[in-house]
Amino acid sequence: MKRKLVFATNNAHKLEEIAAILGDKVELLSLNDIDCHTDIPETAETLEGNALLKSSFIYRNYQLDCFADDTGLEVEALNGAPGVYSARYAEGEGHDAQANMRKLLHELEGKENRKAQFRTAISLILDGKEYLFEGVIKGEIIKEKRGDSGFGYDPIFKPEGYEQTFAELGNETKNKISHRALAVQKLCEFLQR
């Protein structure tokens, strides 16, 4: 029998991406599947902290094995920003990916160093014990958006070793090499022990 795991997110893009990466290794449940309609606040100062806030909330309130993630884009020339604030970087714009990209590109105007990395932290709670997993992919921020697939900063992030952005690579390739894929692979390896 497959292990049931709740993925603590309301982000449909993340849910789809994680489901594709996990395949049939676990029975993945969404927050809707467990009738959780709470917007779990992400108030921690670190990616790991936000992931733990979400997974702890689900475990505490539903007593179900679960995991949550938080992802940040860390740009070297901006001292790691937007980091934990990546989804809401353009203040006052909510979770507006276009506004976030515009702000980031504006802040990088005239800067030579465009090195960046995407980092995902996953907090897993199994039988009340917490485990952390991390995935990192290095790359650079290009000057103009390219590509139509993916979400968030994908049109301006070009991973090391590729000429295409995440948005140009397409989901199949991205789901093999991304920061989230690397973190989920570690999660899968742990679950298969």
UniProtKB/Swiss-Prot annotation:
Assigned GO CC terms: cytoplasm; cytosol
Classification via SUPFAM superfamilies: ITPase-like
Tagged with keyword Metal-binding: yes
Enzyme class (EC, first level): hydrolase
Source superkingdom: Bacteria
Single annotated GO MF: XTP diphosphatase activity
Annotated substrate binding sites: 9-14, 71, 151-154, 174, 179-180
Reported cofactor(s): Mg(2+)
EC number: 3.6.1.66
The reaction(s) this protein catalyses: XTP + H2O = XMP + diphosphate + H(+); dITP + H2O = dIMP + diphosphate + H(+); ITP + H2O = IMP + diphosphate + H(+)
Signal peptide start and end residues: none
InterPro entries: dITP/XTP_pyrophosphatase (IPR020922), ITPase-like_fam (IPR029001), RdgB/HAM1 (IPR002637)
One Gene Ontology biological process: nucleoside triphosphate catabolic process
Active site as annotated: 70 (proton acceptor)
Cofactor binding summary note: Binds 1 Mg(2+) ion per subunit.
Keywords for this protein: Hydrolase, Magnesium, Metal-binding, Nucleotide metabolism, Nucleotide-binding
Biological role stated in the UniProt entry: Pyrophosphatase that catalyzes the hydrolysis of nucleoside triphosphates to their monophosphate derivatives, with a high preference for the non-canonical purine nucleotides XTP (xanthosine triphosphate), dITP (deoxyinosine triphosphate) and ITP. Seems to function as a house-cleaning enzyme that removes non-canonical purine nucleotides from the nucleotide pool, thus preventing their incorporation into DNA/RNA and avoiding chromosomal lesions.
Assembly, per entry: Homodimer.
Family to which the UniProt record says this protein belongs: Belongs to the HAM1 NTPase family.
Protein name: dITP/XTP pyrophosphatase
Species whose genome carries this gene: Bacteroides thetaiotaomicron (strain ATCC 29148 / DSM 2079 / JCM 5827 / CCUG 10774 / NCTC 10582 / VPI-5482 / E50)
